[in-house]
Amino acid sequence: DSGTVYLFYNSEQIDRVSYLEDWQFSLLDNSDGVSLERISPNASSNQQSNWHSAAESIGFATPGRVNSQYQYVGTTESISLQKDVFSPDQDGFEDILVVNYAFSESGLLARARIFDDFGREIKTLFSNELMGTSGFFTWDGVNGDQAKSPIGIYVLVLEVFSVDGGVILAKKIPFTLAGKL
């Protein structure tokens, strides 16, 4: 799809963008329902490089919210856990592992996997997922066999790469799955 969008304020045109379907992320199988998001309000509206497909991790759209591909000035790559201990016992207190991220560029893909203390992969959270420039994802403690993982030490391995396969970031973050004994 292609078209032109006009922005008016008090009947005066203040901005406009003419876009083409090939502005969507090139590795999407289907761009139907995927929003194009402006990366920076400071760059030209008609500059193709200032637009990117909304991140898969937020449902390919951000109506009423900050764009998933919005570029924060001064952002550098960062990955952090909200807490390094969680207890998925449904008591309403730290039941999920929350992983926050921020990247300095848009259009990055990522793979997130969980390993146990013996180095065995127990769960792939996602693979080749188009990420926003900032956001979070979670793990509920359920392993690849759809069973609750046992109490112990685990490692999150997050690999972030560009479309051409270049590794942007590879990080291992240890954390603890706690519970009642």
Say what each PLM segment does.
Residues 1-90:
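Intrinsically disordered, low-complexity linkers and terminal tails enriched in Ser/Thr/Pro/Gly
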Residues 71-181:
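Short loop/turn motifs at secondary-structure boundaries
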